[in-house]
Amino acid sequence: MKKTTIIMMGVAIIVVLGTELGWW
């Protein structure tokens, strides 16, 4: 996998977790 792909996936996961925690 390319570094950019891993970074994009990491950012997406952080955003999802951030919104999930934000609702709680």
Curated annotation (Swiss-Prot):
Keyword Cell membrane: yes
Cellular component GO terms held in the UniProt record: plasma membrane
Localization in the cell: Cell inner membrane
Cytoplasmic side: 1-3
Membrane topology recorded in Swiss-Prot or TrEMBL: Single-pass membrane protein
Transmembrane segments: 4-24
Keywords from the named record: Cell inner membrane, Cell membrane, Membrane, Stress response, Transmembrane, Transmembrane helix
Induction: Constitutively expressed, induced by thiol oxidant diamide, slightly at 45 degrees and slightly at pH 5.5 Celsius (at protein level).
NCBIfam families xref list: PRK14760.1
Name of this chain's protein: Uncharacterized protein YoaJ
UniProt organism field: Escherichia coli (strain K12)
